[in-house]
Amino acid sequence: THSASSAASDVYKRQKMYCDRISKKVINPKPKIKIKKISSSISHIDANNSIGFVAADLGIKTAIKHAQKTGIGMVAVKNSGHYGLSGYYAMQAVKKNLLTLIFTNAPPAIAPHGALKTLFGTNPICFGSPTGSKIPFILDTSISMINRGKIRVAARNNRSIPAGVALDK
C-alpha cells in the first residue's frame, strides 16, 4: 500500500490541477452533497461536483456504517472528481475489520492493443482485506501499464518511457 508520505506527495503534485479545476468551476468548493439511502445496506451520494477527497471520504464512511449494521455496505458516488489513492480509503474499512472493493471510472486514456485511439479509462481498482496481522492486504492498481504521473514526469524531464506503454501518434 502507499505510505502517508506518498499520499501527501500525490496531493502536492496535483495541487495546481485542483486549483485550476476550482477556478474553472469544475470543482465546487461549497458543495451541497446529498445522500440517498436506498436500503439499510446501500446509499447513493450526489457529491455536487465536490473535490473527490470529500466525496470519497463520505462514501467510505457511509459504506462502513452500512457494513457494520448489516454485514454489507455499498455506496455509489456521482458528480465527483479525482480522489487520490484508493488504498487510503480501503485502509479505513480494513481498520474496521472489513473487506473492501473500490473502483471508479476515468476518461479515455488507454488504447486497446493495436489501436491508434484511446478508448478505455485508467479505471482504478482497489481491494483491501484484513489479514489477521498488523499488516493488511491492499491492492491498489489500474488497468493501465503505467500511470499518467510517470508519463508526465518523463516528458518534463525529457526522458523516455518503456516501449509499448503509450501512443505517440
Predicted features, each with a name:
Residues T1-A8, Y12:
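Single conserved hydrophobic/aromatic residue that forms the stacking wall/gate
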Residues S6, H44-D46, D140:
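Acidic side chains
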Residues A7, M17, R21, T62, ...:
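Alpha-helical scaffold segments in soluble metabolic enzymes
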Residues D10-I64:
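Active-site cofactor/substrate anionic-group-binding motifs, chiefly glycine-
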Residues Q15, C19, K24, K30-K32, ...:
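Generic secondary-structure boundary/loop-capping signal
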Residues I42-G132:
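A generic, well-ordered mixed alpha/beta core segment in the N-terminal half of proteins
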Residues A109-K169:
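Phosphate/diphosphate-binding glycine-rich loops and adjacent basic-rich segments that engage nucleotide
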